[in-house]
Amino acid sequence: SFITGTLGQYFTFRSFCPEMAIGLGTPRETLRLVQKQDGIHCIGNKTPSLDVTDRMIRNAEEQHSWQQELCGYILKKDSPSCGMERVRVYKGDMPERNGTGLYARVLMENFPNLPVEEEGRLGDPVLRENFIKRVFVFRHWKDLVAEGLTTHKLMDFHAQYKFVLMSHDQNRARALGRRLAEASGEPVEETAEWYFAELMAILKIRATRKNHVNVLQHLQGFLKNEIDSEDKQELAETIDKYRIQLLPLIVPITLLRHHFRRHPHEFIDRTKYLDPHPAELMLLNTL
């Protein structure tokens, strides 16, 4: 209901079934992944002679044209075609959970920066927020590229996501910022390629409470000459209560929004950290 109901207000969904696409009707025999000498095959669970490996891979490659329009992909947990990770792979009678669905593998190889998640994992508040945030960032980037990318626009984009990146991995975020600054004389297309790949790789890392506290305190510093001692104490206590898990992330963020509305700051007004996705999704309420 969250996917189709809540997210449906912001996303347009397209369903796709690889099994149906290769001609397997419904009802149909279940499939499984089997390790053979020449690699992993997708075969019938009861009929080993039903081997759809080549058809599945070929069909997955044929979906490239519409997949390149996507901003995210929700896959099916444990599916031999659509499982993102830990899919059962049989070698004899003993399965190991170390596989990836054939369709999912081709998708992720062709679009390594595309936000991908399994529907079952979206029940985890941290993974859900992470995936949806990446989808919005991916769409923002696509719009930026469509408008025509310039060095100035790329620098501005990075400035907007600086604190978001720091909440995921401070060291890699700083390294990315330094590398981007050093690349100011390079062709923007070349810079954009490695920059976006690293941006999405950093965002894929789970943001931590420790990193969030660091970012919140950094933002607090912008207000040191703007708010009185009572407000400073309240803000510091709120951040600390988040640190020790007495409050969700939305509380210190809401308080920071309040202060920056009263005391606007040009740089903070542009940052996506305080508004990474629509408030109606309530994704920060459970972090």
Where are these regions (language model features)?
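Short, surface-exposed acidic-centric catalytic microdomains
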Residues: S15-I40
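Acidic, Ser/Pro/Thr-rich low-complexity regulatory regions
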Residues: V116-L287
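Short catalytic helix/loop segments, enriched in acidic residues and glycine
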Residues: S1-R14
